[in-house]
Amino acid sequence: MDGDIENQVELEEKTRLINQVLELQNTLEDLSARVDAVKEENLKLKSENQVLGQYIENLMSASSVFQTTDSKSKRK
């Protein structure tokens, strides 16, 4: 009789551990998918940032407000 109870306890413990492992595997898969999504978003934002940086540079170079003037050479 004690053997049956011990076997039942072991079986319940194994079942609990298997369920815990499966839950952790699912969590890991979810986290891995999230990391991949964040990496993709990061690459997209880097690309957009480069485009915006180039756009700002072009605007600044086309605007007289941002042109550097050497006032000392004009005075001479």
From Swiss-Prot:
It holds the Pfam family DUF2205. GO terms for cellular component: cytosol; Golgi membrane. It is found in: Golgi apparatus membrane; Golgi apparatus, trans-Golgi network; Cytoplasm, Cytosol. Transmembrane segments: none annotated. Residues 6-52 form a coiled coil. It is a peripheral membrane protein. Belongs to the SCOC family. Positive regulator of amino acid starvation-induced autophagy. This is Short coiled-coil protein B. It comes from Danio rerio. The gene is scocb.
